[in-house]
Amino acid sequence: VNKVKRLLKQLKCPMYGHRFGPKKYKFYENIVALLIRYYCRLSYRRVVYFLDLLGIKCPSKSALQYTANKIKSEFWNRLLELTSGAKHEIIALDATGFSRTNPSYHYLRRIDGKIPKIYVKLNTGLSILNRKFCAAKIRIIPAHDIKDALALLRKVNTRKVVADKGYDANYLHEYCFSNNIEAHIPLREYGKSKHKNWSKRRLAAKHFDKTVYHQRELIESCFGSVKRKYGSSVNSKKASTIKSDIYGRLVCHNIFYYFIRVLGQSHANRNFYIINYNIFINSD
């Protein structure tokens, strides 16, 4: 609760959700309840019942749904920026999908049912050094990965970026060249170049480093971590609540990352992560 209060204070958020609305619950109480819901994989009714059992003041089910519907993507991206850090040495770009529902595919095959194909597309950037998500873009209707790459890079401060062949676009390399960012993206070969003046993507291919590029695999590992901990499907129906659901899972990953790393570590590493986690929690 104190960590959420500090984050909202740094974002200069108002005390209440709306200046003309009722002043019964403060804004941080809604955010805490939503983050607990995402972390524990509960429904709106169950998280209200769970917090009531613990004696924690919590808004009603409909109030939580209203808050999740009204929160904009800019707010969640600012939370990701605060919980991941200001500067990043290497950023990895990649995309993954979340299914709309969680059906039993075994049952669907047995009854010759139709396999659902529409999913939610998550395009995000991960800081390689601290394994935290620093920017994200969610599309309810899937689109190509490259369409969100430039918007993600504009939100972060980095020196190097690694991505797969799907992000090999000349305008992305031009942006990296103008902002002194090293782009390690494998070249998509369409055949021999017809022009003598090489494009920025072919100039970047001359400095391509496989050692740096293979660090991109860490973002796929973090995708698996998020889906195992918080679920690989979303139960929300509206576009705004679906986005809040996925953004909240990324914020939970950033906040509880140090604590999760303690499990399964040696005694020396465990003490190191405990000290850093306490510094992170108590930081203003």
Q: Model-found features: residue ranges?
A:
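Basic, low-complexity segments
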Residues: V1-F20
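Polybasic low-complexity intrinsically disordered regions
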Residues: H18-Y39, R45, Y49, S73-E182, ...
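A generic secondary-structure boundary signal that marks alpha-helix termini
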Residues: L42, I56, S73, K192, ...
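DNA-binding alpha-helical recognition surfaces that contact promoter or target DNA
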Residues: Y49, Y66, G224
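A short, basic/aromatic helix-end/turn motif that makes direct DNA contacts
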Residues: F50-L54
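Major-groove recognition helix of helix-turn-helix-like DNA-binding domains
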Residues: K57-S73
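Helix-centered, glycine/charged polyanion-binding patches within enzymatic domains
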Residues: K165-S233
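Basic, amphipathic alpha-helical segments enriched in Lys/Arg and hydrophobic/aromatic residues
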Residues: A205, D209-D284
